[in-house]
Amino acid sequence: MLQPHLVIGSAFTFGDAFFTLFAFAILLVLIRIYAWKPLMGIMKEREEHIGSEIDAAEENRAQSEKLLAEQKSVLQQARVESQTMIENAKQLGEKEREEIVKTARRESERIKEEAKSDIAREKEDAISALREQVGSLSVLIASKVIEKNLDEKEQSNLIQDYIERLGDDK
């Protein structure tokens, strides 16, 4: 048969409720000591780990942005420096070109002046030589004229003959 204390809907007793509450309180204390605190410690540790990972990621992102800005600055500076170097090289090349042209012009003027002075000297030498030859020829002709009395035709033939001899000597 049925036992009276196991029947559903049986009477509620204050002692059973107190014992149940006491057992539940002990269970809560035990759970808090052995499960809740370690679980909360693990959760706190996990929270701190995630927080430190987030902080590290933020710091890495900030460093990356800083490095990117520095690299952009260095790249821009390198571009400016290379442009300056190119401009300087162009200016230096232009100056050297102008200097080479000036030097070539001076050299050509010097050569031209040397050629003019050489021509003038050669001309003077030729004129001197011609004067000497004319002087010698005049003396020779004069001595021949003195030796014989020549008419105009003979005198002309004599001069022509000496001029031809002079041309043959050269």
From Swiss-Prot:
Pfam families: ATP-synt_B (PF00430). InterPro entries: ATP_synth_B-like_membr_sf, ATP_synth_b/b'su_bac/chlpt, ATP_synth_F0_bsu_bac, ATP_synthase_B_chain. The chain crosses the membrane at residues 11-31. One of its GO terms (molecular function) is proton-transporting ATP synthase activity, rotational mechanism. Keywords: ATP synthesis, Cell membrane, CF(0), Hydrogen ion transport, Ion transport, Membrane, Transmembrane, Transmembrane helix, Transport. It is a single-pass membrane protein. GO terms for cellular component: plasma membrane; proton-transporting ATP synthase complex. It is found in: Cell membrane. It comes from the Bacteria. Belongs to the ATPase B chain family. F-type ATPases have 2 components, F(1) - the catalytic core - and F(0) - the membrane proton channel. F(1) has five subunits: alpha(3), beta(3), gamma(1), delta(1), epsilon(1). F(0) has three main subunits: a(1), b(2) and c(10-14). The alpha and beta chains form an alternating ring which encloses part of the gamma chain. F(1) is attached to F(0) by a central stalk formed by the gamma and epsilon chains, while a peripheral stalk is formed by the delta and b chains. F(1)F(0) ATP synthase produces ATP from ADP in the presence of a proton or sodium gradient. F-type ATPases consist of two structural domains, F(1) containing the extramembraneous catalytic core and F(0) containing the membrane proton channel, linked together by a central stalk and a peripheral stalk. During catalysis, ATP synthesis in the catalytic domain of F(1) is coupled via a rotary mechanism of the central stalk subunits to proton translocation. This is ATP synthase subunit b. It comes from Listeria monocytogenes serovar 1/2a (strain ATCC BAA-679 / EGD-e). The gene is atpF.
